[in-house]
Amino acid sequence: MARYRRRSRSRSRSRYRRRRRRRSRGRRRRTYRRSRRHSRRRRGRRRGYSRRRYSRRGRRRY
């Protein structure tokens, strides 16, 4: 069990590092969140493009 715990800790640390880097770019994160809200209105125009992009990244994240 000790080995497993060590592995999980290293994994969580790498995740936190990625999140911290994104937070430092705070502006980008906010724009992404806003675009998701307005994506419903623009879905009619860019159906294939927005769906492919957000379905792959958005679903895995959230």
From Swiss-Prot:
Testis. One of its GO terms (biological process) is chromosome condensation. It comes from the Eukaryota. GO terms for cellular component: nucleosome; nucleus. It is found in: Nucleus; Chromosome. InterPro entries: Protamine_P1. Keywords: Chromosome, Developmental protein, Differentiation, DNA condensation, DNA-binding, Nucleosome core, Nucleus, Spermatogenesis. Residues 1-62 are annotated as: Disordered. GO terms for molecular function: DNA binding. Belongs to the protamine P1 family. Protamines substitute for histones in the chromatin of sperm during the haploid phase of spermatogenesis. They compact sperm DNA into a highly condensed, stable and inactive complex. This is Sperm protamine P1. The gene is PRM1.
